[in-house]
Every structure is written in structure tokens, then in C-alpha cells.
């Protein structure tokens, strides 16, 4: 009798885990965005379970441009043109001090540079805690904060995520300085030339939805104004454009315990592809040790060489490019 009961319990647990893990891989192919009036946390979780993009109004909850220096000491900046070069598999960021990075973005006349995957000092702003209370799912295991912004009309590569929830909180200085976003469902993946960069845990496509490639398949194309929050479901491709230099997007991503289990293979490949596996293990297990280490040697990351500029992509008068000149000056000054 005891053996039968024990086997039954094991079966129920296994079935429960299998059902919820499979739900993490569930996708929707309906090309629609849902508009929602926020009421409480449970209601938003039920809506997000439909695996559709959701847009709702929640003003004054995201980071604005003038708050960036208080929560980030350095910026990771990328050149969108790097993603569309032949044979590109990894796009490394330029690491600059916050003031230098903001100066670069403000002088960029080519709409090429944007900042993402930054190290956020969330304790310096109460907004992250407030957003967690309103958006965090049940049994959340890990939270990832980021703030994304760029030069005017710059855009991010076409990408997707595997977190259980990802919210983009849009803010800006004027009512019309939000983001323009283009999305398409997972069923288009075979036509998108997918790239998996496990070193940076970035999954992207070299299809450019802001330069004509969106005509090859149906996409959602809409604008998110300041004061709104967009929920992007896992395995939905998306790329967004900053409509103004003051456009600022607070990204909050949640991984529940089941989501971590479902993506264990991907996280293992991420750890395996790190240049220094031992130090990254220490970062995950004992983050306090990593904080001390990074504070002692901040300049090591600030002196990384800049990516070479492709002469075929820039006109002969490239030496007059204000943004490129500024990068060189900023790096020398550091």
C-alpha cells in the first residue's frame, strides 16, 4: 500500500512539473496586441498567461533620462550596424562612463548607437520596488533589471527572450517621445536567420524591420507612448526604435522557478560559453564577492578597444563624423 501511494505521489509531481514546463514553451501566433486596464497583480498575470502582447497605462513608474546617472556608473553601448555585417555572430558592446556614453548618444547623427544590458544599481531608485509589487509573478526566482535608450531614431536588433515575463516601461520628456515597436510571432523563425549568442545570452536576427525586411512577412507595428507598459511574451520577436533622445525604456524580466527549470539547458550553455567560467560561477553563487571585485578594478572594462569602422559603410568624409570623433576622444580621456 505504501509503495502504491509513494508511486502515485511521484506520478502527480512529475505530471505537474511536465505540464508547467511545457507551458513555458507555449506560443501564440495571433497577430494582435491586447489593451488592458490595470487593476491588480493577479489580473495582469492572468492576462499575460494568454501569451499575447499586452499594453496598459501606468504613468510615472519608469526611469527617466535624468535619473540614469544615479543608477548606472557605466553604459554598455552597441552599434546597430554591427548586427548586419556579413558573418557576424557576436556583437560586443563599447563600455563607457555614463556621462561619456550620454554625450556619445546625444551627438550621434547617424541613429546608430543604443544602450542595453546595463548594470543597474536598483537600490538607488524606489521605482523598481514599486514595479515589482505590481508586476512580479508568483514563485518568481530571479529578476533582471535594465534601462534601454539610444540616439534619436536608433533601433534595437530583432530579438526574442525566454523569460516567463518581460515588461517594457516607457518614459520620455514629451507625450510623443516613446518608442515604435515591430513584432512578429514565433512561427516566422525559420525565415529570420536566427543567431544564438550564448556568451552574451542574446538571441537575434539580422533581418532589419526598419529597413524594408518587414515587407517579407506580417508584423505588428505600433507606437508606445510615455506612461505605458508593454508586456512582451516569450518567443515573440521584437525590435523597437527610440523616437527621441529622451525616450527611456525600463525593462523588467522575471524568471519563475518553473521557467528556470525549463531553460536549464540554455543557462548551462551560457555558463559554459563564458570566458572565465569560475568567476561567473562565483558571480551567480556569491554576488557580494563579485561586487567587491568589480569595484576594485573598474578601469579594466573601460579600456576595451573600440570596434573597427568598416570603410565601405561610411563615406570618405568619415573623419567629420561627430559621433565617431567623440568616441575616440572619450576613450582617450579615460
Model-identified regions with their sequence ranges:
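N-terminal accessory scaffold of Fe(II)-dependent oxygenases
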Residues: 1-229, 239-334
